[in-house]
Amino acid sequence: MVVLVTCVLAGTALARRLGMSAPLLLVVAGCLGSYVPGIPDVALTPDLVLVGLLPPLLYAAAIRTSLIDFRRNTRPIALLSVSLVIVTTVGVGLVAWWILPVPLAAALALGAVVAPPDAVAATSIARRVGMPRRIVTILEGESLVNDATALVTLRTAIAAMTAGGITVWSIGFDFIVSAIGAVVIGVAVAIGVGYVRRRVKDDLTDVSISLLTPWIAYLPAEEIHASGVLAVVVAGLLLGHKAQLIQSASSRVLERTNWATIGFLLENSVFLLIGLQIRSVLDDLRETDLAYSTIGWACVAVLVATISLRFVWVFASTYGPRLIPAVRRADPAPPWHYTAVISWAGMRGVVTLAAVFLLPGDTPHREVFVAIAFAVTAGTLLLHGLSLPWAVRRLNLPPPDPHEDHLQEATVYQKAARAGLKRLDTEMNGDEPEEVIERLRRRSLDRANAVWERLGGTAEPPSVQYAKLRRSMLESEREEVLRIRRNGHIDQGVLQHVLDSLDVEESVLERSAQDSTAEREVDLVPSGDRGRCADLRTYVDAPRPRTPEGCEQCLDDGTSWVHLRMCMACGYIGCCDSSPGQHSAAHWHGTEHPVMRSFEPGEAWRWCFTHQVTG
């Protein structure tokens, strides 16, 4: 285990340094390592993968997946994770049946084995090269559900191999029962675990319950022959969505850190283990009576069929229904290059290798099926892993704009601050010191203003200057506390509490520093909420600025400003809320002109004071 984790850490660090996909590098390293003398034979057994690795992997992904985004993309996710898996099962099964001397049921089982893509590799590339977020959401949503579809389909094919008498109706019935049972158990586990965690006050106990949750959902579902994988996903989606209501803030931070670490180690260990299987897979082929040319042809044909079917299905299901004018008007088609990238992101992973070992020992040419599953897994990882970054760059897919993110973040903070100040007004009873109330108001507004500051200008805004100086102060404060600790005159528990508080403050400053260093390459023109705001629809054309040299009031007063805003009604130039004068907001209060726009170079966003939305 120590050697495995060490190799994973070294491999991911090397991949990051070389600018390549970590899963791809780890698979190659595993293939080479399988032939190194002294390396033990680590078999990927079904129990190890399906019970030991898959539940925590899926749960870690599910709790960080937005349930709202998942619902918003239900149609494409369902078409990929359910329909495409079935289409691939049938298509690949027919190809294998045509090439290999095996029964149709066994060939369909092979189709189910290679049907589910593994989005870990694709999304790791997606985040590295900057794919649009909707593509990443669809790929992650597909990976959460397609394993369940493939395993249920495989179970049905195995039943047809061993018992016979399986009909289309029985397959459909088994699938529906398995899905419904999994959803019921997943919802029940989410409700039960949520009820318990809401009443647990100790963070360590709360996070420990979280670590058990994947198996609390998986094992009962499998016991009643439902999909344990789908039960884990449902429980994870619901608990992640309700985390703000059932957990304390410190528990949420601790849980995110723990699951991020677990997910990182498991995801990358899996790809190293995949590579380590190559030697045993090739050794087992010596037992087959098929010609190596037939095996090679079958591997290539199944790989090509797997890739081609995804292309055909994704394009057909995306643009076929939109040939109907009513459908096209209600749901316009996405750009073709979005569809092309999703079609090309069909890498296979550990579920394919684990599923092939679920085939009974008496399956005809089982060792050949294992080799084909490995060939499809390794082939898609190598082919897509090497070419997907190039394809994304070649198709000029727009990456997420950090300044667009800052704009949306600032809008949310502004609305949150507004809600918090309203609550403050209702909570006050008149006995509070004025300096306490003013400090609360200032702190609430400063958080939103700090994000607004990062939206433009070349000079360092006050929040960045504060973070830089405060981090330097914290460094000296920590050195002094460590000096006191070396003297041994203060209790270690007291000193550790002080050091922990310094760590918490510095971690917040580090997050702010990372956000402030993000750069954009295009002008900031957000989609915003213009469609829902009458004022933003009205004030579109910019008037002539009255004082293009700077804030009108600051120029009169001889004071300075941070960033500039322009009134879209009269052309008044005022300073932002981070500036001492806050003249832009004062102009709105005095004139009730609702819309202003940024007057910073390269920015075209607007803000409605009345409705608190951007456009």
Task: Label each region the model flagged.
Residues 1-411, 415-418, 482, 486-489, ...:
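Transmembrane helical cores of multi-pass secondary ion antiporters/exchangers
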Residues 107, 565, 572-573:
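Beta-sheet entry/capping signal
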Residues 488, 567-568, 605:
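Intrinsically disordered, low-complexity proline-rich regions
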